[in-house]
Every structure is written in structure tokens, then in C-alpha cells.
Amino acid sequence: MAPRSKSAKAEDRLSALRHNPSTRVLIIGGGINGIATFRDLALQGTPVTLVERSDFCSGASAASSHMIHGGVRYLENGELRLVKESLMERNRLLASAPHYVRPLKTTIPIFSLVSGLFAAPIRLFTHAQGKPKERGALLIKVGLMMYDLFGRNQGKMPRHSFLGRQKSLAEMPHMNPDIRFTATYYDAAMDNPERLALDVLRDGVEAGDHAQAFNYVSAVGWESEGVVLRDELSGETFTVAADVVVNTSGPWTDLTNEALGQPTNYMGGTKGSHIVLDNPTLFEACDGREIFFENSDGRIVLMYPIMNRVLVGTTDTPVDMRDEIVCTDEEVEYFFDLVSR
């Protein structure tokens, strides 16, 4: 395999930055947050430079659940403003990027009527983050009514529905026969988040020469003149002065701040792993929808069809962000155990 190399045009642009090393805003991190910030500033005519140490959108933005999540599970913690904002942004993406973002029918299997109903008000008003109890039909009904209410004026998604055990099993015969109800609502998903991110990036780059984006360039230090950048292909370092530096490194935010001489402890250091299964039986059992439920250990579990396969997730495991982040054999076995139930 031939080593990576920059195109002549990209090398010319980077050379121009070395010879005129200043910008109004320097954005560090080319995931979706960095790219979206870059686009917004570029379209406003602000001189802006974006740097990414690897491929654009190659980190957490690509290794996600591929959902455009309206935030239904945050209702129980009283994060109502977050849910309203998430629904608004979800519906905007459904309208503006229907070639990438699609409605996702989501079904919740329910095994009790009132479980969690009395603990929920405490969590709602105290914003407590403790391990939740199993959610029964009444609690889920209240939550989905609120979810429909918050999203009613922002899109045309169908309202939620409930089915009893008999109708649920007739519709989805592979479902656990111990269920008492199923609740179905709509969220959204996207098969290729990287493609949407590149479209957003292109909007910014095409705004004019005042907006420059470079991959395989990392922020490695700080000097009085500005941020020290390193060309990851040549190893050359140079310093860029900026009026404002925006750190959009995602899970690596603290490591970037440390490199810039400003140690922080903002990020929790956890990972959520997923696997993608080529299993026709499971694909058929999903019936074109997401199955969304809570495991006995308190973790949220999701599985849904994606590109003729089935995505299953997710874990919540502490990690050191200096290490390579991978899905371990133990996590794979955990997912297999979930699917086999």
C-alpha cells in the first residue's frame, strides 16, 4: 500500500498557510461539530481555518449509532430543553437532507404496566442521574405524549402508538413472548454520516478563500505566537496565530487542551461500542424498524437495519483516550448475548 500524500493543490494551500500563518478563527478537530462551526463562520465571511489530524469525520462522528436522535430518553431526567432542541434539529435534517436522513420507526417492548412510575417524578424534578428502574407502559405512554407534543410543530412524523401483547406478536412474531405491550414512535437515522459531514465541509470551503480546511494536520503545542501545528505526512511543524481558537476535538478535547498548555478534565472518558451483523434472520425480525429497550444492567440497547445488515449497540465503558479505541471481544460477546434473548 502506497503511503498517503497530499495532492498538489492541498500542498499549495498548506504552503500558503505556512507563509501567511494567521487566521481570525482556528478550529481544531474535523468531526461534525468542527465542520459545522467551520461552515457557519465561512458563510458569514469570517476568516477561518479548520485542521484535522486524520481523515475528516473519521473519529466519533463516524463511529456512532448512526441516529439523529430526538432525545426521548432524556425526558425522564428533566432535560426538556435538550429534547426540544434535539427534535427541532432532527426535523431540520429530515427536511434539508432527505437523501441522507430518513425516518426510523422505533418499537419499545414493554414487560410491565406501572414499573418506574413512582421514581420518575423524582428524577424529573431533581435531574438525578442514577440507574433507572424498568419502565412500564404508563411511564412510557406519558413520555411519548410529551415527545409528540414537543415535536408537533416542527415536522410531519406520525404520533406514537401502543399495541397489546397479541397484536404486537402478530406484527412481530420474533418478539419475546413475555411482553405485555409495545410502544412505537418515530426517530431518524442516517446510513452515512461521513457523507453529510463532507457536504457541510464543502459548503464552507466553497464560501471563498477566507475559509481553509486541512486534514492530516494536528495541533501539538502552544507558543507566544500561536498554536503549533504539525503536518502529519511530512512531520514539519509551524505556528499559526489566531484571534480565537475553538477546540472541537470531541472525546479528545482534554488531550488537545493539554497539548496547548491548558489542562482540563471536561470529558468522561467512556466509549459506546456497536457491532454490525450480517444475519438475515435478525434483519427480518427487525421488520424495518429499530428495537429500543433497556437491558437488565441499565444500559440502553438498540438494534436496527442499516445497509442490509443490523446494527446492535451500545456499551458504556471507561477508556483512556490516549489508547486505541476498539470494540473488544468481551463487548462482542455481550452483544451476542443480547441478541439471543
Regions found by a protein language model. Give the residues of each.
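N-terminal Rossmann-fold NAD(P) dinucleotide-binding loop
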Residues: G34
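Active-site substrate-recognition segment that forms the wall
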Residues: D40-L43, P47, V51, H99-T106, ...
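Glycine-rich Rossmann-fold phosphate-binding loop(s) that bind the pyrophosphate
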Residues: G29-G31, R53
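A conserved short coil-to-beta-strand element within the FAD-binding core of flavoproteins
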Residues: N215-V227
